């Protein structure tokens, strides 16, 4: 049985604002986690989250919007890394294109997240969001001698994109 935690609560307002409703009995992505369904007229699909206490959250995006959507919200302090199989849009800070085939990192808690998501392009991704309770406290206790700053590692990651060409597809 799924139980709500602090990490789920951070998404509730943003999800409701964009027409998503929680479906705690939806097992689309398994019995653990919370599935959200895009129930409004603005789009279709699902968003799934699974949080482990106040340590981390796994996320699956599998939805699209009928019209361009401006997303703007204050992301809590965290480190996020996400693989985008499909997406189209722009992030405003930092200014980067959102394109398919990218691994992107984001450091939350600094400034509001702002992005324009293009209409009718599915957002299909999987990611993990790691909280300070995990990357500053838990990892340091578990690996005190080997511990290196995960924050510094994320700052250097930024984004990595795979560019698909017709030549690569023929191999």
Locations of regions flagged by a protein language model:
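Conserved small/polar residues in nucleotide/adenosyl-binding loops
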Residues: 164-171
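N-terminal regulatory/effector-sensing and dimerization cores
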Residues: 35-160
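Membrane-cytosol interface segments
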Residues: 1-57, 64
